[in-house]
Amino acid sequence: SRGLGDVYKRQVVYLYVDDPVAKHTFLESAKAKGYDVLVMDGQLDNHYMGWYESKHEKERFVRVDSDVIDKLIQKEEQLKMSLTEAQQELLRPVFESQMPTDEKIHYQIAFEAMSPDQAPVVITQNEFMRRMKEMARTSGGGMSQFYGQMPDNFTIAVNGNHPVVIDILNDVEKSYGDKLKSVTKKIDAAVAEQARFDEVTKEKKEADLSDEEKKMREELSGKVIALRDERNARLREIGSQNRLVRQIIDLALLTNGMLKGKHLTDFIQRSISLIEK
């Protein structure tokens, strides 16, 4: 076993879990990596960890669901992602089209290099922000009150190496058809034109740019934005019709105990429908 504290760049990281039952999936992922995990389920544990870290600046506590398993403790050797940056750009609006909506929760999409045998989507919550909000609930006032009023922030981490995610990309490209290559080619050309303009004018200060140059800059920027908006709108439309995208997001929500009410009912009905196929 690697022990409770794992050292990376002279920093000791202690992995912990606050609820071994609710966070069982994350706990098992950490154990599969050979890590031991502390159980910190006391009401004052957040305060204790903050106090301990203030006394030991090279040691920190990280909850097992605060990031994807391969980033909880950074290593010199990192996994490579199958998806290129261009492919991530295509998939981002697809997944955004199926993002859960909640006034009290803010979600953001991130593509991560994870093992292909891990889940296609994992939902994580930043350690610092979560801890501040939890402390706000027990203390109140000052900065704690400020953090307490902020919405909960979660990251929908898409496994860029998972076969299901690759299949979704292939389905999206097939649904978009030849028009996808056409609009992407136009975007690349517009971006290249914008880069050439920036290269020519990079030595000039804003005040030295002529009215014509400022107008051209705005036109080039507007062209790139318009083309990307056109492509993203179509990708969102395709994504909104892809049940598999919603299914793997809901699986991640279910793992975190965040799938309830009508959304849970819809997930069950969709699961039955997919099984019947």
Q: Locations of the language-model features?
A:
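Long, intrinsically disordered, charge-dense linkers/tails
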Residues: 1-277
